Amino acid sequence: MKSGVARLGYLGHTVADMAAIDTIFGDVLGMQRREVAGSQEVMYRMDGRHHRFVFSPAKSDQLSFIGWEVDSLQALRAVVERLKNSGKEVTKASPDLCLLRSVFEMYRCTGPDGVPLEIYFGGVDD
């Protein structure tokens, strides 16, 4: 059984011009826009997954997190163990954050460039 990251799951960005995001991702690329209840965040999907992109309004454009998917809980725990053994601080995501990202279980750490990495299992297809 594979015990590493299987695929890129989603990307999170802060953006200064949310209208431009709607134009590019919705009108030009034809992705489906999804609202986030109680938030200014907007998600876009391009396939069967709940979302692949998360955009939050901000004063500047910046990559804000990267979601990496694994194929099993066993693989998730193996990745987390390897990260911890390499000296990375890894924290388990709250149930609320897992619900927001539409994943079953997730852990977070910071990548070498300072961007938060989210390693998860159980992305929602809908």
Question: What are these language model-derived features?
Answer:
Residues 47-50, 69-70, 96, 101:
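Non-heme Fe(II)-dependent double-stranded beta-helix
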